[in-house]
């Protein structure tokens, strides 16, 4: 992958799961049951990213009905759409982060960068679709 000239917007997943500001700790814990999920994106009805919540943010929270948004943060978890993919890749490896929300200049959520477990590149829409289709269906 030629990351030098590419931007975050060119590689981001464009339809990441979004959670409303009313999402609770318990709801996000349930979302994190999927081991491929590393971050929950809390997004206002107008599309503005309010928080990025990671597992460690809620690990010690004893109140399952607590609103989750105040437990997350944006700093260090977002990148601008025009950011150099090579620079973002280096920063994610240096910090150990595998997810970064991609935002517009005014804070709207545009997408999500998902660093592969191999750390050699980013997941594509096709990768995510294939993984979803390969999951067994649970019948109740």
Give the label of every model feature segment.
Residues 1-15, 49-97, 105-140:
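Tandem CBS (Bateman) regulatory domains
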Residues 17-61, 69:
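Acidic (E/D-rich), amphipathic helical modules within compact regulatory domains
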Residues 42, 102-103:
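Sensor-regulatory modules in signal-transduction proteins
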């Amino acid at each position: 992958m030629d990351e030098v000239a590419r931007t975050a917007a060119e590689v981001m997943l464009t339809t990441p799961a979004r959670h409303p500001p009313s999402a609770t700790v318990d709801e996000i814990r349930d979302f994190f049951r999927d081991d491929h999920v590393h971050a929950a994106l809390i997004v206002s009805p107008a599309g503005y990213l309010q928080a990025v919540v990671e597992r460690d943010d809620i690990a010690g929270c004893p109140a399952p009905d607590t609103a989750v948004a105040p437990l997350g943060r944006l700093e260090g978890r977002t990148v601008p759409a025009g950011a150099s993919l090579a620079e973002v890749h280096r920063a994610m490896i240096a910090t150990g982060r595998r997810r970064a929300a991609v935002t517009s200049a005014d804070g709207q959520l545009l997408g999500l960068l998902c660093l592969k477990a191999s750390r050699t590149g980013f997941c594509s829409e096709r990768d995510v679709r294939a993984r979803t289709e390969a999951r067994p269906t649970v019948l109740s």
